Swiss-Prot record:
Descriptive protein name: Acyl carrier protein
Keyword Lipoprotein: no
Gene: acpP
GO molecular function, one term: phosphopantetheine binding
Location relative to the cell: Plastid, Chloroplast
């Protein structure tokens, strides 16, 4: 896993949810950090903007923690390179 992607997503989540960065771990569920459904939509939009990717709604619904977000981002970046 790319540490730069991790750091960027960790910052996005911490800023969007107003939580301390050290609470945003790979396995911490966004809901456990206080995210409701609107927060999750805003997180996905912020991630899309930060990485210049598109996350379809059906995929966005599957992203519940940092690890899943990073996995999706890495896959999307790899696809753009092809």
């Amino acid at each position: 896993m790319s540490s730069s992607i991790f750091d960027k997503v960790q910052n996005i989540v911490a800023n969007q949810l107003g939580v301390e960065k050290d609470k945003v771990t790979e396995d911490a569920k966004f809901a456990a950090l206080g995210a409701d459904s609107l927060d999750t939509v805003e997180l996905v939009m912020a991630i899309e903007d930060a990485f210049s990717i598109d996350i379809p709604d059906e995929d966005a619904e599957k992203i519940a923690n940092l690890s899943q977000a990073i996995e999706f981002i890495q896959h999307a970046i790899d696809k753009k390179k092809d």
